[in-house]
Protein backbone atom coordinates (compact mmCIF):
# COMPACT_ATOMS: atom_id res chain seq x y z
CA UNK A 1 0.00 0.00 0.00
CA UNK A 2 1.25 3.48 -0.85
CA UNK A 3 2.11 5.74 2.07
CA UNK A 4 3.12 9.34 2.74
CA UNK A 5 5.65 10.87 5.12
CA UNK A 6 5.28 14.33 6.65
CA UNK A 7 8.38 16.10 8.04
CA UNK A 8 7.87 18.28 11.12
CA UNK A 9 10.08 19.97 13.69
CA UNK A 10 9.51 19.91 17.44
CA UNK A 11 8.16 22.84 19.38
CA UNK A 12 5.88 25.60 18.18
CA UNK A 13 5.45 24.33 14.62
CA UNK A 14 4.48 20.84 15.81
CA UNK A 15 2.01 22.15 18.39
CA UNK A 16 0.35 24.55 15.96
CA UNK A 17 0.18 21.84 13.28
CA UNK A 18 -1.86 19.46 15.47
CA UNK A 19 -5.24 21.12 14.69
CA UNK A 20 -4.44 20.94 10.97
CA UNK A 21 -3.58 17.26 11.27
CA UNK A 22 -6.82 16.69 13.16
CA UNK A 23 -8.74 18.37 10.35
CA UNK A 24 -7.18 15.84 7.98
CA UNK A 25 -8.14 12.98 10.32
CA UNK A 26 -4.53 12.39 11.38
CA UNK A 27 -3.55 11.82 15.02
CA UNK A 28 0.09 11.14 16.01
CA UNK A 29 0.59 8.08 18.21
CA UNK A 30 3.42 9.77 20.17
CA UNK A 31 4.33 13.27 21.27
CA UNK A 32 7.84 14.16 20.04
CA UNK A 33 8.30 16.47 23.03
CA UNK A 34 8.21 13.48 25.37
CA UNK A 35 9.27 10.67 23.03
CA UNK A 36 12.75 9.99 21.68
CA UNK A 37 11.29 8.50 18.51
CA UNK A 38 12.18 10.30 15.30
CA UNK A 39 9.65 8.36 13.21
CA UNK A 40 6.13 8.59 14.62
CA UNK A 41 3.14 6.63 13.45
CA UNK A 42 -0.40 7.94 13.26
CA UNK A 43 -3.90 6.56 13.51
CA UNK A 44 -3.76 6.13 9.74
CA UNK A 45 -1.38 3.36 8.68
CA UNK A 46 -0.59 5.10 5.38
CA UNK A 47 0.64 8.30 7.11
CA UNK A 48 3.75 8.70 9.24
CA UNK A 49 5.63 11.68 10.67
CA UNK A 50 9.38 12.22 10.81
CA UNK A 51 10.80 14.65 13.36
CA UNK A 52 13.66 16.75 11.98
CA UNK A 53 15.46 20.00 12.70
CA UNK A 54 13.48 22.95 11.37
CA UNK A 55 16.31 23.95 9.04
CA UNK A 56 16.46 20.43 7.58
CA UNK A 57 12.76 20.12 6.69
CA UNK A 58 13.08 21.48 3.11
CA UNK A 59 16.03 19.17 2.41
CA UNK A 60 14.11 16.06 3.48
CA UNK A 61 11.22 17.06 1.22
CA UNK A 62 13.41 18.17 -1.69
CA UNK A 63 15.15 14.80 -1.87
CA UNK A 64 11.99 12.74 -1.32
CA UNK A 65 12.84 11.39 2.13
CA UNK A 66 9.54 13.05 3.11
CA UNK A 67 6.62 13.70 0.77
CA UNK A 68 5.40 16.76 2.64
CA UNK A 69 6.76 19.07 5.30
CA UNK A 70 5.97 22.19 7.27
CA UNK A 71 8.65 24.87 7.32
CA UNK A 72 8.93 28.54 8.18
CA UNK A 73 9.26 31.04 5.37
CA UNK A 74 12.59 32.08 6.89
CA UNK A 75 13.95 28.56 6.43
CA UNK A 76 12.58 28.34 2.89
CA UNK A 77 14.20 31.62 1.86
CA UNK A 78 17.58 30.39 3.10
CA UNK A 79 17.10 26.99 1.45
CA UNK A 80 16.08 28.48 -1.89
CA UNK A 81 13.00 26.27 -2.40
CA UNK A 82 14.43 24.18 -5.24
CA UNK A 83 12.29 21.15 -6.08
CA UNK A 84 9.51 22.17 -3.69
CA UNK A 85 5.86 22.93 -4.32
CA UNK A 86 4.56 25.45 -1.77
CA UNK A 87 0.77 25.33 -2.03
CA UNK A 88 -0.29 26.77 1.33
CA UNK A 89 0.64 29.46 3.80
CA UNK A 90 -0.64 27.79 6.97
CA UNK A 91 -0.63 31.05 8.94
CA UNK A 92 0.98 29.37 11.97
CA UNK A 93 4.19 30.07 13.94
CA UNK A 94 3.89 33.71 12.94
CA UNK A 95 6.67 36.18 13.65
CA UNK A 96 8.81 38.62 11.68
CA UNK A 97 12.34 38.83 10.40
CA UNK A 98 13.83 42.14 11.44
CA UNK A 99 16.96 44.20 11.99
CA UNK A 100 17.79 45.11 15.58
CA UNK A 101 20.55 47.24 17.12
CA UNK A 102 21.76 48.41 20.52
CA UNK A 103 19.65 51.24 21.89
CA UNK A 104 21.37 54.51 21.04
CA UNK A 105 23.07 53.17 17.90
CA UNK A 106 22.54 55.58 14.97
CA UNK A 107 21.22 53.07 12.45
CA UNK A 108 20.00 55.74 10.02
CA UNK A 109 23.49 57.22 9.73
CA UNK A 110 25.15 53.82 9.45
CA UNK A 111 22.87 52.71 6.63
CA UNK A 112 23.14 55.68 4.31
CA UNK A 113 24.03 54.69 0.70
CA UNK A 114 27.68 53.72 0.61
CA UNK A 115 27.71 52.97 4.32
CA UNK A 116 29.14 49.77 5.76
CA UNK A 117 28.04 47.87 8.84
CA UNK A 118 28.69 44.49 10.39
CA UNK A 119 25.65 42.26 10.85
CA UNK A 120 25.36 38.99 12.78
CA UNK A 121 22.70 36.51 11.67
CA UNK A 122 21.97 32.93 10.75
CA UNK A 123 19.82 34.21 7.87
CA UNK A 124 22.68 35.08 5.54
CA UNK A 125 20.74 35.05 2.25
CA UNK A 126 17.89 37.16 3.62
CA UNK A 127 20.24 39.69 5.18
CA UNK A 128 22.40 39.91 2.06
CA UNK A 129 19.39 40.57 -0.18
CA UNK A 130 17.93 43.13 2.22
CA UNK A 131 21.04 45.25 2.56
CA UNK A 132 21.94 44.94 -1.13
CA UNK A 133 18.54 46.44 -1.89
CA UNK A 134 19.54 49.44 0.22
CA UNK A 135 22.77 49.92 -1.75
CA UNK A 136 24.89 49.07 1.27
CA UNK A 137 28.10 47.22 1.90
CA UNK A 138 27.61 44.79 4.76
CA UNK A 139 29.94 42.36 6.51
CA UNK A 140 27.88 39.32 7.47
CA UNK A 141 28.85 37.14 10.42
CA UNK A 142 27.19 33.73 10.61
CA UNK A 143 25.95 32.79 14.08
CA UNK A 144 23.67 29.96 15.17
CA UNK A 145 22.19 31.36 18.36
CA UNK A 146 22.23 34.06 21.05
CA UNK A 147 22.13 36.75 18.35
CA UNK A 148 21.34 39.43 20.93
CA UNK A 149 24.82 39.09 22.40
CA UNK A 150 26.63 40.18 19.23
CA UNK A 151 25.95 43.96 19.43
CA UNK A 152 26.50 43.99 23.19
CA UNK A 153 30.08 42.72 22.98
CA UNK A 154 31.07 44.57 19.80
CA UNK A 155 30.94 41.58 17.46
CA UNK A 156 28.39 43.31 15.21
CA UNK A 157 26.60 46.61 14.77
CA UNK A 158 23.26 44.95 14.09
CA UNK A 159 21.54 41.58 14.00
CA UNK A 160 18.98 40.08 11.65
CA UNK A 161 16.77 37.65 13.53
CA UNK A 162 13.24 36.40 14.08
CA UNK A 163 11.17 38.39 16.54
CA UNK A 164 7.83 37.44 18.03
CA UNK A 165 7.06 39.66 21.03
CA UNK A 166 10.35 41.56 21.20
CA UNK A 167 10.78 40.79 24.90
CA UNK A 168 14.23 39.20 24.45
CA UNK A 169 15.44 42.26 22.55
CA UNK A 170 14.18 44.60 25.24
CA UNK A 171 15.74 42.50 28.01
CA UNK A 172 19.10 42.92 26.29
CA UNK A 173 18.80 46.66 25.61
CA UNK A 174 18.20 46.18 21.89
CA UNK A 175 15.50 47.63 19.66
CA UNK A 176 13.99 46.81 16.29
CA UNK A 177 14.84 49.33 13.60
CA UNK A 178 13.59 47.66 10.45
CA UNK A 179 11.23 44.89 9.39
CA UNK A 180 12.47 42.66 6.57
CA UNK A 181 9.58 40.23 6.13
CA UNK A 182 6.58 38.72 7.91
CA UNK A 183 7.19 35.04 8.62
CA UNK A 184 4.78 32.13 8.91
CA UNK A 185 4.98 28.41 8.24
CA UNK A 186 4.19 26.89 4.85
CA UNK A 187 3.18 23.46 3.68
CA UNK A 188 5.76 22.16 1.23
CA UNK A 189 5.41 19.15 -1.06
CA UNK A 190 7.90 17.14 -3.07
CA UNK A 191 6.95 17.70 -6.70
CA UNK A 192 7.43 14.07 -7.74
CA UNK A 193 5.41 12.84 -4.75
CA UNK A 194 2.52 15.12 -5.70
CA UNK A 195 2.35 13.47 -9.11
CA UNK A 196 2.83 9.89 -7.93
CA UNK A 197 0.81 10.02 -4.69
CA UNK A 198 -1.81 12.63 -5.47
CA UNK A 199 -4.66 10.42 -4.22
CA UNK A 200 -3.11 10.46 -0.73
CA UNK A 201 -1.66 13.97 -0.71
CA UNK A 202 -4.51 15.99 -2.20
CA UNK A 203 -7.01 15.20 0.62
CA UNK A 204 -4.41 16.39 3.15
CA UNK A 205 -3.91 19.62 1.19
CA UNK A 206 -7.66 20.17 1.00
CA UNK A 207 -8.16 19.51 4.73
CA UNK A 208 -5.31 21.83 5.69
CA UNK A 209 -6.66 24.55 3.38
CA UNK A 210 -10.08 24.32 5.02
CA UNK A 211 -8.64 24.52 8.55
CA UNK A 212 -6.35 27.55 8.11
CA UNK A 213 -7.27 30.36 10.47
CA UNK A 214 -7.07 33.94 9.20
UniProtKB/Swiss-Prot annotation:
Compartments, as annotated in UniProt: Cytoplasm
Record carries keyword Methyltransferase: no
Presence of the UniProt keyword ATP-binding in the record: yes
MF annotations from Gene Ontology: ATP binding; ATP phosphoribosyltransferase activity
Pathway annotation: Amino-acid biosynthesis; L-histidine biosynthesis; L-histidine from 5-phospho-alpha-D-ribose 1-diphosphate: step 1/9
Catalytic activity of the protein: 1-(5-phospho-beta-D-ribosyl)-ATP + diphosphate = 5-phospho-alpha-D-ribose 1-diphosphate + ATP
One Pfam family, short name: HisG
HAMAP family on file: HisG_Short
Name recorded for this polypeptide: ATP phosphoribosyltransferase
Native organism taxonomy: Bacteria, Pseudomonadati, Pseudomonadota, Betaproteobacteria, Rhodocyclales
Gene name of the record: hisG
